[in-house]
A protein has these predicted regions:
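N-terminal Rossmann NAD(P)H-binding glycine-rich loop of SDR-like oxidoreductase domains
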Residues: 10, 18
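Substrate-binding pocket helix/loop in short-chain dehydrogenase/reductase
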Residues: 84-85, 89-94
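Residue(s) in the substrate-gating loop at a strand-loop-helix junction
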Residues: 128
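Alpha-helical segment proximal to the catalytic Tyr-Lys
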Residues: 113, 157-161
Length: 167
């Protein structure tokens, strides 16, 4: 049985991904800071903050030890802030990048070693049309998703020789 990890899988797009993986016979782990409001039978929740490298490392180690493989990682965790750049606090902008971009980086970095050990895998990074369109009053969301797009392209080339596909 293949194993899928979905970050931010407790609601919305992430929850839909979890359900689709279940339908297709995957063992599914959902990583989020909070327990899901809606429990999905068959989805194993692990409390994890994607901005905390130790938290991510421990979660992935547990999943790999329990399941013997990590075949797909869906980097879905993220959020958006709205407002004019001139009124946005630096701490808010940094938090946006911490979750949307650095969370994606931390999770990808930590899963690659397991995928290399098993001879391949797939990393899916969720982005947004806001990345190329740079939506007014969502500058930091747009910028964080544009950074995810660049990371995705660079990482895809780095790990291609190890049969790891990134999109």
């Amino acid at each position: 049985m293949k194993t899928a990890i979905v970050t931010g899988g407790s609601s919305g797009i992430g929850l839909s991904c979890c359900r689709k993986f279940l339908e297709n016979g995957y063992r599914v782990y959902e990583l989020s800071r909070r327990e899901p409001k809606i429990q999905t039978v068959g989805v194993k929740h692990i409390s994890c903050d994607v901005t905390d490298e130790h938290s991510v490392s421990e979660a992935f180690k547990k999943i790999y030890n329990d399941s013997g493989s990590i075949d797909i990682l869906v980097n879905n965790a993220g959020f958006g802030i709205s407002g004019a750049v001139e009124f946005t606090e630096l701490a808010e902008a940094k938090k946006q990048f911490d979750v949307n971009f650095f969370g994606c980086f931390i999770c990808s970095k930590n899963v690659i070693k397991y995928m290399r050990l098993q001879g391949g895998g797939r990393i899916v990074n969720l982005s947004s049309l806001a990345a190329p369109l740079a939506i007014p009053f969502q500058a930091f969301y747009s910028a964080s998703k544009a950074a995810v797009n660049s990371l995705t392209l660079a990482l895809a080339n780095e790990v291609r020789p190890f049969n790891i596909k990134v999109c």
